[in-house]
């Protein structure tokens, strides 16, 4: 009877719950120890990152025929894809508008551009650099000399 009185007092003070929690914790620890070592290894393997994995870069090549296509080109730059724009077949006024728009989008995205050839431009987002041995188009007589024919 005295034992039940002590249990009631301990229960009233909240000590009985701690004993139950400790027993449950021990039971959980025993269950974890009983699990095979392979499961722990599989869990740990998920947190490992390969530092040498490289993401493939897709270069988009476009030959716009209308000014309506420039938004799609700018969207590719926003998605961090380099874009080669071929304007050799475009009318000079349309080509100028397209280059102006895409140049502005490239500048806004902190990207860069390079004239590759007559009417061909390379626009890259800010996560890429252009390494080139080509002459700088600004060093020529005009920035868009290909349009003066």
Curated annotation (Swiss-Prot):
It comes from Pelotomaculum thermopropionicum (strain DSM 13744 / JCM 10971 / SI). Signal peptide: none annotated. Homodimer. Interacts with FtsZ. The keyword Cell division applies. GO terms for cellular component: cytoplasm. Belongs to the SepF family. GO terms for biological process: division septum assembly; FtsZ-dependent cytokinesis. Keywords: Cell cycle, Cell division, Cytoplasm, Septation. The keyword Cytoplasm applies. Cell division protein that is part of the divisome complex and is recruited early to the Z-ring. Probably stimulates Z-ring formation, perhaps through the cross-linking of FtsZ protofilaments. Its function overlaps with FtsA. It is found in: Cytoplasm. InterPro entries: Cell_div_SepF (IPR023052), Cell_div_SepF/SepF-rel (IPR007561), SepF-like_sf (IPR038594). This is Cell division protein SepF.
